[in-house]
A protein has these predicted regions:
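A short, aromatic/hydrophobic, helix- or strand-capping loop or linear motif
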Residues: 21-22, 66-69, 104-112
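Short beta-strand segments
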Residues: 13-48, 56, 62-67, 75-79
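Short, surface-exposed beta-strand-loop junctions and turns on beta-sheet-rich folds
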Residues: 50-52, 71, 132-134
Length: 147
């Protein structure tokens, strides 16, 4: 699998299931619209007072499942990373990544409390269950940089 192959699969899916944990360690999940940077960063927007934003400010560890939620999709990416809330030039860069997938995101910029979250990957598992045996590949952050 090449870098382009993995990015192409991840970018084909505009939505993912995002998970975080609350301050009391309760698991919480949400479907979010995602954009994927060339460095495998995920970007999504949310409101600052949403459960996910509050959780990620307290504990930036986050996980996603991309793909595999439709009957015709037999491939998935499991993604673990660290979230942050960029500002300044970095915020503008990640916003442009997000707007390339969700142009209507610009219309939400005036929403009170809107934030953009960037997630840097620590670990990705790509699984394709179509071939037998299934193809399962794992990449840590160092391997992703070399891919």
């Amino acid at each position: 699998m090449t870098r382009t192959d993995l990015l192409t699969f991840m970018r084909a899916e505009k939505f993912a299931v995002q998970t975080s944990v609350s301050r009391t360690y309760a698991p919480q999940a949400a479907v979010v619209g995602i954009a994927v940077s060339d460095d495998f960063e995920l970007v999504f927007d949310t409101l600052a007072d949403s459960r996910k934003a509050v959780n990620l400010r307290a504990n930036p560890s986050v996980a996603f499942v991309i793909g595999g939620i439709r009957d015709d999709v037999v491939r998935t990416v499991q993604y673990e990373g660290v979230a942050d809330f960029p500002f300044g030039d970095e915020l503008r860069r990640v916003q442009e990544t997000y707007f390339s997938v969700f142009p209507d995101g610009r219309d939400r910029l005036h929403w009170k409390g809107l934030v953009h979250v960037r997630v840097k990957p620590l670990w990705i598992r790509y699984s394709n269950y179509e071939p037998q045996p299934p193809l399962v590949l794992e990449f840590d952050a160092a391997a992703l940089r070399l891919l």
